[in-house]
Design a protein with these regions (language model features):
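Membrane-water interface segments that mark the loop-to-transmembrane alpha-helix transition
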Residues: 1-4, 29-30, 34-89, 98, ...
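Alpha-helical transmembrane segments of multi-pass membrane transport and lipid-handling proteins
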Residues: 46, 66-93, 171, 249, ...
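C-terminal transmembrane helix end/exit motif
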Residues: 48, 117-122, 126, 145-151, ...
């Protein structure tokens, strides 16, 4: 997980330096769309994660999970066909069409890979799930540096590096979960009831995750629509720097979830207090790094200096978002209170939407 944060740091800090602002901004637009590709599984994967979290891998019903894999893969292909068609018909801008198409390809690969990662994480095979995720980012960074050596700095090259990394990690997940993936078709069960139940269980968590990402996403959409692609890219860089810490915190939350699921109810309050106190101490200590980091980035990335001033507002948000992601959300998911998560995130998302409309349409002020 730390390695994933380090590779993300390299991309965030080095590539804005060597790419033009416009090229980097298109790359950030692609990354922005990737934030919402999880919407298209409709909570199917989240339902599996919630229903079977805490079980041992050896106790999983291989035939049932194999059947769900086939049905889920078919569903993704159908969704992607519809999206490709809509993109071809409705989008006229060449760059936007290319980015949409690549995001659709990434949607198929990433959602299918997430199914296997969740299976490993919910059964506490954390080392294997980490290997899958690390392999993606390591290959991605290696390809990017190879492209730098050859002088290829276009955003399209970066997108291909990202998709190749994700595809490699998907192939690796096939191998790690081969006892589920590689079975005879005769074992396939057309069990729509199980699929719909997984969606029913997981859709609240999926919607809450989407609503959570839309809190900042709506702001970014407002910037994209009201200003130019360069402004969008500069603000996105600032958000990416602040989100590096959240990447690590979310990874820790995935580790804690199966442990909490197996913990006795009477022990949960004490564990909650200890986690909360430890996290707050660390998060507030990290805020001390704001001023030296801002000073270094102003020198390193002068083209983005006018956007880096927003770090003063965004950086402290990581404290509260970290507490929500690591402590509160993890506990609510373990206690099957996904509807409460959805209500909270939906309310904040609506607030973000209203404020964004006011600041973009009425005030026209970043």
């Amino acid at each position: 997980n730390l390695l994933i944060v380090l590779t993300s740091s390299l991309v965030v800090l080095i590539f804005p330096k060597i790419m033009g602002v416009t090229e980097y901004s298109y790359w950030q637009l692609y990354i922005f769309y990737l934030t919402y590709i999880g919407f298209f599984h409709l909570g199917w994967i989240d339902g599996i994660y919630l229903k079977y979290g805490g079980l041992e891998y050896t106790n999983l019903d291989r035939k049932q999970f194999y059947s769900q894999m086939i049905l889920f893969s078919s569903f993704l292909m159908l969704i992607s066909l519809v999206l490709f068609t809509l993109n071809l018909i409705t989008v006229r801008d060449e760059n936007a069409r290319y980015i949409y198409n690549m995001a659709i390809i990434s949607m198929i690969v990433t959602n299918l890979r997430t199914l296997y990662v969740y299976i490993l994480q919910m059964t506490n095979r954390l080392k294997d799930s980490s290997v899958i995720l690390i392999s993606d980012r390591v290959l991605y960074v290696l390809l990017l540096f190879m492209f730098i050596v050859f002088g290829w700095h276009e955003y399209k090259v970066m997108i291909w590096a990202d998709i190749l990394g994700r595809t490699f990690s998907l192939m690796l997940s096939f191998w790690i979960c081969k006892d589920i993936v590689f079975q005879s078709l005769s074992k396939f069960i057309l069990d729509f009831k199980e699929s719909l139940d997984n969606i029913r269980v997981g859709i609240n968590l999926m919607l809450s995750n989407i609503a959570s990402s839309m809190i900042i996403g709506i702001v970014r959409m407002g910037i994209q629509w009201n200003w130019n692609i360069e402004t969008f890219g500069k603000v996105s860089l600032t958000l990416s720097i602040s989100n590096l810490l959240m990447t690590f915190i979310n990874a820790i939350g995935l580790v804690i979830f199966p442990l909490i699921k197996r913990t006795k109810t009477e022990n949960l309050p004490k564990i909650y207090s200890n986690l909360r106190n430890a996290l707050m101490l660390v998060m507030f200590a990290i805020l001390l790094f704001y001023y030296p980091l801002k000073f270094i980035l102003d020198i390193w990335l002068p083209a983005y200096k006018d956007a880096l001033v927003f770090m003063a507002l965004i950086f402290p948000m990581s404290v509260y978002e970290g507490k929500m992601a690591l402590v509160i959300n993890t506990y609510l998911k373990a206690m099957r209170m996904e509807k409460d998560i959805l209500k909270i995130n939906a309310l904040v998302m609506l607030t973000s939407m209203v404020v964004t409309l006011v600041t973009t349409l009425l005030l026209n002020n970043l």
